[in-house]
């Protein structure tokens, strides 16, 4: 039987394709269709590192659009507005607010909201060759009109008046000084090469953090697209280019500077974090030489943090004598005791008789304002948008009692699991250690999260911010280093995990959401230790129209000493989560104590030996 079966099946089964040709082609056609469909999916995945539109928070990734007919080529979106949504929609303007101008008469006229009023101003009218590229760059960035603060500040600056501006977060302050500065410079330094006007640092922008400096540089690059303007951020890598463009006495004479900034030296605050993680080098390392820029090519706009710029001025490597426009962004922070020792010499170094100054911030305490007016001609023109020192009205603010540190973490997890914390979001904490603790905890929860603080190298911070903008990271745990100026238009919720130390800190933190008229949400956790300071923040919520429980408004006001104490240092808190012991941290502290004890012991031994030797010499 077996042999008969083998005989019948030895040749194998044969299929006559010619006989069943029609049936066979039906299956082949289906296979080809399936293969074609799969290849299209693979190609789409390969080319589409693009996210689905539901996950593309900032609008950075291209999404396919089906056009029935070919249309004229649309203007591409610029890097400046890469996080603001689709290039086909204009950026929504913030809600209209009352703008108050005070100062010596006659007060300057505000610009019209249409863009041509910027380049056709009677005192600084640009030609079509000068103004055309600027208008084109603004159009590419989806900017089709000026906002209130930009009209007011632009009018002041174009009429050569020093200006002090207080405007809410997200109202467009950066463009309010960048645009008129570009208009007043008229031509790039490259076109003015060899002339006095094209030498040195022509315009200077000073900001408290490196991250904000990089963001402002991006704005300048976007609005100067199409012309060869020279702008840069002052870093270790660009120091040489800066002092070659605006050489000081030490560079001209070939002498070494007479001062040296120590590694890691800062202003006592983590915000001046550019130098915290990389050595600035000694003066000998960057010994001044004869300028390698003999043509004297200047820098149109230099964006700098105070510590590094002050170092160059103090070592006589850079001259700001030709600088005609000086802007202090986040000026209340720059005029505080932490930065004032560096900022005052910078302002003094801008010795051009025609120098024009502009100070801007979302908050301006009385002390900082009086100090600012001393540096402004005739006290400057004071521009206030809305109510001074108030929170942005587009943010829904609330306070949440959590009871303890473990309660904070539980509340945060509940917000995430219940969908009340949509991505992308920012979580503010009070210190570097707590940022790292919370970051590690959330990573273990499986959340796409990163941390940004002054303890990280700037390259790591830049990478984390970039990932956050493109949607690769959904949450950022941050310290005060990102509380000011940073523009994340896609952020929907801000969590104050640790209670803010001051009202300005609270206003700047929650100002990272609800920008440019978009709705946002801010939730602030508080515990028993935050009780004495709860009333001040509750008053901010009430002034913004947010509901506040009556008991918070009836609480005792904090004393002046309590306010000063909190402003100097945040309250001590238990580890994030409040549960268990951090064995690694305890081991690190123990090791540090052992090293310090060993050093003291060796020092005492050396002193003891020295005393014995002196005694023996006396006896001899």
Curated annotation (Swiss-Prot):
PROSITE patterns noted in UniProt: HELICASE_ATP_BIND_1, HELICASE_CTER
Enzyme class: hydrolase
Single GO molecular function: ATP binding
Keyword RNA-binding: yes
Domain notes: The Q motif is unique to and characteristic of the DEAD box family of RNA helicases and controls ATP binding and hydrolysis.
Subunit record text: Interacts with the U3 snoRNA and is associated with the 90S and 40S pre-ribosomes.
Name assigned to this protein: ATP-dependent RNA helicase ROK1
Upper lineage: Eukaryota, Fungi, Dikarya, Basidiomycota, Agaricomycotina
């Amino acid at each position: 039987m077996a042999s008969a079966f083998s005989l019948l099946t030895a040749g194998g089964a044969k299929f006559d394709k010619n006989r069943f040709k029609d049936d066979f082609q039906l299956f082949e056609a289906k296979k080809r269709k399936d293969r074609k469909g799969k290849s299209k999916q693979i190609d789409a995945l390969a080319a589409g590192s693009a996210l689905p539109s539901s996950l593309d928070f900032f609008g950075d990734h291209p999404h396919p659009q089906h056009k029935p007919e070919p249309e004229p080529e649309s203007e591409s979106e610029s890097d400046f507005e890469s996080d603001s949504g689709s290039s086909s929609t204009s950026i929504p303007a913030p809600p209209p607010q009352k703008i108050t101008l005070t100062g010596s008469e006659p007060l300057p006229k505000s610009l019209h909201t249409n863009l041509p009023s910027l380049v056709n101003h009677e005192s600084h009218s640009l030609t079509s060759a000068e103004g055309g590229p600027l208008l084109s760059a603004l159009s590419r960035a989806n900017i089709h009109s000026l906002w209130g603060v930009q009209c007011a500040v632009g009018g002041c600056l174009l009429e050569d008046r020093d200006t002090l501006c207080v405007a809410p977060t997200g109202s467009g302050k950066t463009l309010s000084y960048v645009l008129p500065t570009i208009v007043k410079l008229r031509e790039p330094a490259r076109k003015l090469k060899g002339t006095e006007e094209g030498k040195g640092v022509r315009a200077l922008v000073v900001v408290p953090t490196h991250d904000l400096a990089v963001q402002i540089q991006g704005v300048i690059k976007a609005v100067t697209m199409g012309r060869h303007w020279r702008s840069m951020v002052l870093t270790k890598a660009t120091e040489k280019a800066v002092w070659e463009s605006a050489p000081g006495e030490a560079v001209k004479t070939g002498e070494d500077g007479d001062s040296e900034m120590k590694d890691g030296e800062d202003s006592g605050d983590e915000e001046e974090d550019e130098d915290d993680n990389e050595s600035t080098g000694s003066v000998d390392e960057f010994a001044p030489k004869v300028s390698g820029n003999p043509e004297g090519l200047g820098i149109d706009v230099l964006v700098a943090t105070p510590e590094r710029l002050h170092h160059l001025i103090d070592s006589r490597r850079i001259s700001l004598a030709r600088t005609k426009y000086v802007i202090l962004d986040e000026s209340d922070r720059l005029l505080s005791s932490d930065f004032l020792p560096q900022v005052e010499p910078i302002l003094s170094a801008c010795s051009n008789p025609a120098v024009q100054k502009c100070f801007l911030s979302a908050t301006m305490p009385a002390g900082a304002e009086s100090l600012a007016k001393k540096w402004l001609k005739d006290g400057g023109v004071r521009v206030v948008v809305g109510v001074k020192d108030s929170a942005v009205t587009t943010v829904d603010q609330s306070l949440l009692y959590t009871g303890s540190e473990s309660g904070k973490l539980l509340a945060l997890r509940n917000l995430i699991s219940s969908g009340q914390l949509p991505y992308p979001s920012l979580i503010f904490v009070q210190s570097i250690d707590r940022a790292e603790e919370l970051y590690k905890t959330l990573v273990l929860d499986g959340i796409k999260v990163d941390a940004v603080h002054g303890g990280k190298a700037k390259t790591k911070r830049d990478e984390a911010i970039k990932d956050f903008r493109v949607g690769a990271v959904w949450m950022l745990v941050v310290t005060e280093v990102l509380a000011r100026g940073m523009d994340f238009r896609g952020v929907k919720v801000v969590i104050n995990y640790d209670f803010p130390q001051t009202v300005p800190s609270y206003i700047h933190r929650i100002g990272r959401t609800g920008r440019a008229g978009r709705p946002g949400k801010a939730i602030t956790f508080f515990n028993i230790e935050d009780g004495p300071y709860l009333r001040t923040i509750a008053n901010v919520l009430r002034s913004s129209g947010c509901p506040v429980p009556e008991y918070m408004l009836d609480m005792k006001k904090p004393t002046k000493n309590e306010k000063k104490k909190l402003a100097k240092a945040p309250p001590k808190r238990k580890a994030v989560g409040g549960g268990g012991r951090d064995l690694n941290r305890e081991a690190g502290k123990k090791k540090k104590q052992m090293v310090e004890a060993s050093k003291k012991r060796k020092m005492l031994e050396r002193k003891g030996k020295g005393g014995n030797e002196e005694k023996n010499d006396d006896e001899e």
